[in-house]
């Protein structure tokens, strides 16, 4: 069983569906997907939690692939408010939902090994290859951040993929320390920087497990459709997600996931 953690609000349904389709199309291993969500409409009317209907449909899709697959919906609204409500980092670079992974050690249902994935990720090969990496002596495994490893520190990582050893995380209080930083220190990339600063021991692994720019590389397992910095013909950023099919064809020249995305469109129409 591969244990996956996805976080977000009701707007991440497209990302979760595309990602899980690509994942389950490339593995025979059973998948247990934990969906961590919350309702935070006090900040934004769009910040509604992943619905029970959305979670149930995702589980139905997964079980068509493998009857042992499962989806567990975790509403952590009260826990979030207790830990982070009103803190300075609620207005972080993305949304407060980026902070949810920092609550994982407080959730009894979370197992000892857990693969956290950002919602803008697609899986290009068997996810088991990543999940079976040995992290016994580490808090987590991660891949260097494309820009941060040059601009911040050589070992600065991208938190869009984190293979957690939750047993060690609880022992070292990694996430507890990260939450304290979130409450007390304003940071630009709050969740990522808090984990980085709170780390005791991490394992840096190959970029094939969090490829952040070139999605046609042979052997790549995780393709991360994160924001990219382009310098030519003028400095700018580019941010196209996998469910924006026309855009990833036109601007990213990415056709790797066309069959998955065709399936996604059929499934989305079925859900609606």
Annotate each PLM feature.
Residues 127-184, 192:
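Conserved catalytic core of nucleotide-sugar-dependent glycosyltransferases
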Residues 25-32, 59-72, 199-203:
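Structural alpha-beta junctions
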